[in-house]
Amino acid sequence: MLCGDVESCRVWFMSAEHLTRRCEKACTHHSRLVENMFHIMTGKAAALSERVEVLSRRSIREKLLCYFGLQTGGDDCGSFHLPFTLSALADYISADRSAMMRELRKMKEEHLVDIDRGQVTLHHALA
């Protein structure tokens, strides 16, 4: 069920033109709707841009380091929580899960990164 636990709901269909043009009354709720749609679209565009940045790397190691760098804001050392499972991370970087895990093990042995229950810690620059 689309509405979850709600007993009744309403779906409002509207044309794209209705979203992109201001109404004659310049009402606040319409302005807020346009603003919210803009924020959603820019968030999705940023996420797609980051994904392209990661996928443009050749090796699994380069993809992982690029992704980790994006998550830490480019800090030399940093820590963050993976927003998904390691299997989903392999899908995100378009890599075989076992090959990705092998590369993560090598990176851990080289003291580049630690991963514990989804918590990723970087130990030095990712250059």
Please describe what each predicted stretch is.
Residues 1-38:
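Cyclic-nucleotide recognition modules
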Residues 19, 38-49, 64:
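Hydrophobic alpha-helical core bundles mediating ligand binding, dimerization, or RNAP-core interactions
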Residues 23-30, 48, 71-77:
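Basic, amphipathic alpha-helical hairpins
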Residues 30-34, 53, 78:
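Residue-level recognition of alpha-helical structural elements
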Residues 63, 67-127:
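Phosphate-/nucleic-acid-contacting segments
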